[in-house]
Design a protein with these regions (language model features):
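Exposed, interaction-prone assembly regions rather than primary DNA-binding/catalytic cores
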Residues: 89-112
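Short amphipathic alpha-helical interaction segments
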Residues: 32-44
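Short alpha-helical segments that sit at the start of domains
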Residues: 1-10, 112
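Short helix-capping/hinge SLiMs at alpha-helix to coil transitions
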Residues: 13-19, 48-50
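A short, conserved structural fragment
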Residues: 46-56
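Short, amphipathic alpha-helical interaction segments positioned at domain boundaries
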Residues: 67-90
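Minor-groove-contacting beta-hairpin "wing" of winged helix-turn-helix DNA-binding domains
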Residues: 55-64
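A short acidic, leucine-rich amphipathic alpha-helix
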Residues: 23-30
Length: 112
């Protein structure tokens, strides 16, 4: 059984609903993976339609539509914040584009 399948089954059987959420640290220890690997696995499962929710208390398999909707709202909020940061960085990019021209200070110019 692949790690993500085992993870989905484990959450569905033992951690259904927010009241039964499991911490990231517990999952990392149980499945012997780093936090970044766990997040990647959770994201892949969600992408496959597996209803895994996250709360302050950790991760759980959704027990209700409300739990799932809350996680969806949380993800959408993060998407908006990431998109805002991306737009800001993209607007700064022209300042870093190499025009291929060499710039030399001139005598009496604005060189220190």
């Amino acid at each position: 059984m692949a790690t993500n399948e085992a993870l989905a089954e484990y959450l569905a059987l033992h951690h259904k609903g927010e009241a039964n959420a499991v911490t990231s640290r517990e999952l990392e220890c149980s499945f012997q993976m780093r936090g970044s690997e766990l997040r990647r696995e959770i994201n892949a499962l969600r992408g496959d339609g597996i209803p895994i929710c996250s709360f302050e208390g950790g991760y759980c398999y959704a027990a209700t539509a409300e739990e799932l909707e809350r996680t969806i709202r949380q993800l959408r909020s993060r998407i908006k914040k990431i998109a805002f940061a991306e737009r800001g960085l993209s607007s700064a990019l022209p300042d870093y584009v190499d025009t291929g021209q060499l710039s030399l200070p001139l005598d009496g110019g604005d060189a220190p």
